[in-house]
Curated annotation (Swiss-Prot):
5-amino-1-(5-phospho-beta-D-ribosyl)imidazole-4-carboxamide binds at H27, S94, N255. Residues 101-333 form the ATP-grasp domain. Belongs to the phosphohexose mutase family. This is 5-formaminoimidazole-4-carboxamide-1-(beta)-D-ribofuranosyl 5'-monophosphate synthetase 1. It comes from Methanosarcina mazei (strain ATCC BAA-159 / DSM 3647 / Goe1 / Go1 / JCM 11833 / OCM 88). GO terms for biological process: 'de novo' IMP biosynthetic process. Keywords: ATP-binding, Ligase, Magnesium, Manganese, Metal-binding, Nucleotide-binding, Purine biosynthesis.
Length: 356
């Protein structure tokens, strides 16, 4: 992984009055570009081939310029060009997936957030160690598939967007569906309501909901719409579907907004706080936007089954603010909050605390 010192050397040659915010044209890029423009930054969209035409339909979120690459791996050959334009990269889930975690870790361009989180986020066993170390309640983990005696969720390492997930109730079902060439995790299937909680951790603000270092914000929350799981049971009972050879899949196709009972907010903040505090000790902190992927049970317990350590697509619901973000600042999206953090870090001469 590129070192923090190397990144700081690059920043010495930056014109900090003319920073360009850049990301790959996908995932949450519209929101990122819109938020950056609202905070006075130039924007750059990175794309393979011709720029997507749909950006013409959204002029407020259309990037000021494009970097055209032959492939996503080709971004690694454009790092000098990016640095000459004072670029700070905003990583989102698709950016990391398309470029590859190894390339992303080595990319010689200043990047918002702490790249050290990749090691802990992409390995499900390390992710579990992190969350359990923070005192987070997680679904039970089953090490031997022969011990399956009820519904379980099976996830392959690195699976995102719902791909690579399946549910099994017996070892026989597991054995029929599993791809043993991939590394997988078996988790207890928790019944309840799924909530995806969108937080923002700032190491440079010391107001509001403060932690041992910096402060924590809750910006929004959502639930994912999944195909075909959300509609499949209109066709019959689970048993009838299985007999017909139809099994649910969990590919994310969109998102719907949610708010939580106000009485749950103390627990929601506590979860975010514990995860951040644990990250500070493990790898120097998870900076900026992150999401805890949870299930709220009928006993009002919150179980966390995964973490995403950067902006998630569910925040796209709230480009003009959310019921929570509106209580911090009007018209505050996660994309705009990222731009504010960079702007504030430049003003305070603390960019070293938020980039890697």
């Amino acid at each position: 992984m590129i070192t923090k010192q190397q990144v700081l050397e690059f920043l010495k040659n930056y014109d900090l009055d003319n920073i360009t915010i850049a990301t790959v044209c996908s995932h949450s890029s519209l929101q990122i570009f819109d938020g950056a423009r609202k905070e006075g930054f130039r924007t750059m969209g990175i794309c393979v081939g011709k720029p997507p035409k749909f950006y013409e339909a959204f002029p407020r979120a259309k990037p000021d310029e494009y970097l055209i690459v032959e492939s996503y791996e080709d971004i690694m050959n454009k790092v000098e060009e990016l640095r000459k334009k004072n670029v700070i990269i905003i990583p989102h889930g698709s950016f990391v997936a398309y470029l590859g975690t190894e390339n992303f870790a080595e990319m010689a361009v200043p990047t918002f957030g702490n790249r050290a989180v990749l090691e802990w986020e992409s390995d499900r066993s390390k992710e579990r160690e992190w969350l359990l170390g923070a005192g987070i309640h997680m679904p039970g983990k089953i090490d031997d598939p022969r011990d399956i005696n009820g519904p379980v969720m099976v996830k392959y390492d690195g699976a995102k967007g719902g791909k690579g997930f399946f549910v099994a109730k017996t070892y026989e079902e597991f054995d029929e569906l599993v791809d043993r060439t991939q590394k997988y995790t078996i988790q207890e299937f928790i019944t309840g309501t799924r909530y995806y909680l969108h937080y923002f951790y700032s190491p440079i603000r010391n107001e509001g909901y403060t932690l041992s270092e910096g402060s924590l914000e809750l910006l929004s929350m959502d639930r994912r719409v999944e195909s075909n799981a959300d509609e499949i049971f209109r066709l019959g009972s689970p048993r009838e579907l299985i007999e017909a050879g139809i099994r649910p899949t969990y590919v994310v196709t969109g998102n719907v907004p949610l708010v939580a009972r106000e009485s749950l907010l103390p627990l929601i903040f506590s979860l975010g706080e514990r995860v951040v505090e644990e990250s500070l000790g493990l790898f120097g902190g998870m900076i900026g936007a992150f999401c805890l992927e949870t299930v709220f049970t009928d006993e009002l317990e919150i179980k966390v089954f995964e973490i995403s350590a950067r902006i998630v697509a569910g925040t796209n619901l709230y480009i003009s603010g959310s019921p929570y973000a509106d209580l911090i600042q009007e018209d505050l999206s996660t994309g705009r909050r990222i731009a504010q953090e960079i702007k504030e870090a430049v003003r305070k001469n603390q960019l070293d605390k938020i980039i890697s």
